[in-house]
């Protein structure tokens, strides 16, 4: 039986439907996998403009909202146990033009978009000029978003030296571009196969596209 504790749910592996998959991808078949799609953000850009939002934090919010819907993207190893965080917060990169480096910042997730965007703006105001890699105290319950707005791409992969027990999904956003009457944007996701499969990634990517189509309604 799964056990509830403050902030987490401890998974009872003996009762988990993915027990064998988890054990396989934690041992002899340990791996991550990546998938890249070209999102249609035409409607989303219109919504962002109409509401006076900024695109980057708006898209971070969309990913955060949908990631938090699914347990497989909130999993982690904690004190030797597989757990599911009650919620996860987005970590994201901030580029510093003067040094051509970046910082890894994070903001608390809020389901309400305006509250999240306010929190994001406050964090940028406080930490945005700090050149440290981690300008803000690190927390455990995070996933990660990065942006490479200088180029578009059709494939993206992170080659991690040590993937053991790193279950947080990593998203990478590319430069958006016009194709016909649409605006498309590359989005890559990398996940650990121990906690999710192609089905889960496909469902999430389809939900992100649907949310973009509906314009944050």
From Swiss-Prot:
Task: List, from the UniProt record, the residues annotated as the active site of this protein.
Answer: 193
Q: Which domain of life is it from?
A: Bacteria
Name the enzyme's class. Answer: transferase
UniProt entry tagged with the keyword Acyltransferase: yes
**EC number per UniProt:** 2.3.1.28
| A Pfam family reported for this protein in Swiss-Prot or TrEMBL | CAT
Instruction: Output the GO biological process annotations, alphabetical, semicolon-separated.
Output: response to antibiotic
Q: Which UniProt keywords apply?
A: Acyltransferase, Antibiotic resistance, Transferase
What GO molecular function annotation could you give as one example from this UniProt entry?
A: chloramphenicol O-acetyltransferase activity
The answer to whether keyword Transferase applies is yes
**Catalysed reactions, as listed in the record:** chloramphenicol + acetyl-CoA = chloramphenicol 3-acetate + CoA
Spell out the family assignment given in the record's similarity comment.
Belongs to the chloramphenicol acetyltransferase family.
Any idea what job this protein has?
A: This enzyme is an effector of chloramphenicol resistance in bacteria.
What this protein is called in its record is: Chloramphenicol acetyltransferase
User: What is the originating organism of this protein?
Assistant: Proteus mirabilis
Gene that encodes it: cat
């Amino acid at each position: 039986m799964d056990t509830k504790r403050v902030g987490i749910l401890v998974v009872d592996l003996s009762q988990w439907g993915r027990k064998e998959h988890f054990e396989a991808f934690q041992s002899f078949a340990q791996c991550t996998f990546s998938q890249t799609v070209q999102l249609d953000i035409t409607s989303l850009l219109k919504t962002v403009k109409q509401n006076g939002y900024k695109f980057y934090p708006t898209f971070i919010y969309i990913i955060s909202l949908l990631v938090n819907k699914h347990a497989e993207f909130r999993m982690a190893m904690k004190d030797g146990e597989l757990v599911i965080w009650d919620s996860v917060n987005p970590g994201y990169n901030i580029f510093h033009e003067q040094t051509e480096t970046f910082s890894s910042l994070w903001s608390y997730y809020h389901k309400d978009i305006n509250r999240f965007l306010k929190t994001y703006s406050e964090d940028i105001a406080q930490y945005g000029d700090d050149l440290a890699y981690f300008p803000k105290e690190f927390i455990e319950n995070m996933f990660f978003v990065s942006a490479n707005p200088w180029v578009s791409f059709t494939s993206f992969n992170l080659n991690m030296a040590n993937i053991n027990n790193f279950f947080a999904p990593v998203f990478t956003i590319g430069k958006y571009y016009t194709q016909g009457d649409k605006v498309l944007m590359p989005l890559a996701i990398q996940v650990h196969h121990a906690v999710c499969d192609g089905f889960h990634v496909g469902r999430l990517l389809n939900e992100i596209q649907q949310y973009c189509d509906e314009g944050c309604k």
